[in-house]
């Protein structure tokens, strides 16, 4: 009887340890992102990634923000081509 009880307690402890480690790993993978999304602009994104990033940086530029990265996404709205910029701000976000 003691052997069965010890086995059950060991299984419960192992479950708790494995579950706790799994939660900690997920928390480390998720990093806070501060992103700023612009409005739809008529036209298309440039084909070169560097040109698209520069275009979006200029569109969303402000004197008190520096962007770590900008992405340009082509969309279609009301049958016409548009693009939308998303820029990621360097941490901390409130500066």
From Swiss-Prot:
GO cellular component: extracellular region
Main location: secreted
Gene Ontology BP annotations: defense response to fungus; killing of cells of another organism; signal transduction
Domain of life per record: Eukaryota
Residue runs in coiled coils: none
Secretion signal span: 1-27
Disulfide bonds: 34-93, 45-72, 56-85, 70-87
Keywords per UniProt: Antimicrobial, Disulfide bond, Fungicide, Plant defense, Secreted, Signal
Keyword Signal attributed: yes
The keyword Signal appears for this protein: yes
InterPro entries the UniProt entry points to: SCRL
Entry's localization field: Secreted
PANTHER family listed in its UniProt record: DEFENSIN-LIKE PROTEIN 241-RELATED, DEFENSIN-LIKE PROTEIN 245-RELATED
Family, per entry: Belongs to the DEFL family.
Protein name per the record: Putative defensin-like protein 252
Organism, scientific name: Arabidopsis thaliana (Mouse-ear cress)
